[in-house]
Amino acid sequence: MKTKKFLESKQKSINWQITLKVLIIGVITIALLVPKFMILDLIGQRQHTAEESSKEVMQSWSLDQTVRGPVLAIPYTERNIDSNGKELNEEKEFYLLPKKLEIEGQVFPEIRKRSIYETVVYESAIKMGGHFDISGFDALKIPPENILWEKAKILVAIHDLRGINDRVEFGWNDSVYAFSPGMENKLVGNNGISLQMPQLLPQDFPAHFQFTLNLKGSESLNFAPLGETTEVTLQSAWNDPGFTGSFLPAEHTINNEGFTASWKVLDFNRNFPQQWKNDEYRVTDADFGVKLVTVADHYQKSSRAAKYGILIILFVFLSFFLNEIITKQKVHPFQYILVGFAVLVFYLLLLSISEQLGFNLAYLISSVSVLIMILLYSRTFLKKWVHAIVQTLILTFSFGFIFVLMQLETYALMVGSIGLFLVLALTMFVTRKINWYGE
């Protein structure tokens, strides 16, 4: 009778110890969230530092570029009668966009480094041509005698004028003119170049134009579809482009040697006409172009990986706890803490090494280093190599599983959900014969 009571008392003690251990593991897991969030904050700080370094390079070189033009701005006189019957003459402007606009660009990328951080900059040769036509001009209902043709201007907006490498000459029919810096009219942009056309006459139309921009910039190059038909072709040796803006290319080719992309945009595809008066429309909302994407996205990947940190810790703690239950080999809470910190140190190694060697190689080096450390350490308290190896293999699977999720963007949720389902099913299978109450 005493023996039975002793066994029951001992079993209750064991049950209480298991419950207490589960609670302790839960508290440790929650406590480890604090350093995990500190690591996420550190990743954000390093990313901010990299972005600031990139901005410094761009400020010294030239910013991202957007080219909008050419636009023909022609003043006219509007006659009004005030309340006293006095005639007032007010000078206003109307705007004509090209009937046809063709753009051919060669982009020559270059990597600039500041400290350990890289920024992509470029030089470009952009040939622009086409023709203007005033066949639809009558819709504006401006009396011909009120038009001040001698004050007409050509406007070309350029986001960062520091990027202009050479003087820009404008071919107009059989004549050549030189652009001047600055642009009073902000219709097409805040910065740009302009050209006075003092000899412009209505009989000059249709008028053909062509000019070349040798332009340097950073990260992206964009254009506005100002032609009734706008055709743009860009070529570059950069093999990782991102197409941005209101329109994607109609055709593009990307390979190891670079990319070629072609756009065709009609006036029907945008929200402004070919001619208008005053400031009725703006042309700044239809830009499109290319971004030279840098593959150094290790901060985003490191951040995503760190967000899975608690999942890996749960996998590891679960495997150690089940090992305790199955083998009766106890693991001290302090040993759980050290193993948890080892997993978190993995993310610090990943962040620091990826800044030098890239994400994939950094992931391999960091995971192997932590796996070896945990293998050798767990051998000291699990007593047998086979148990330590099993725990290390489980952690290896966890690291590998997270790495696969990092490579998958579209299917990451589905693969992650299936993976968790299989882990839960395996845990149920392994623990199906454990008598938790000793009955």
Give the positions of each predicted feature.
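Generic detector of multi-pass transmembrane helix bundles and their immediately adjacent loops
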Residues: 310-439
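Soluble non-transmembrane domains of integral membrane proteins
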Residues: 48, 52, 59, 85-286
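N-terminal Lys/Arg-rich, disordered targeting/topogenic segments
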Residues: 1-14
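Charged, low-complexity helical/coil segments in non-catalytic cytosolic or luminal regions
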Residues: 84, 95, 148-151, 158-181, ...
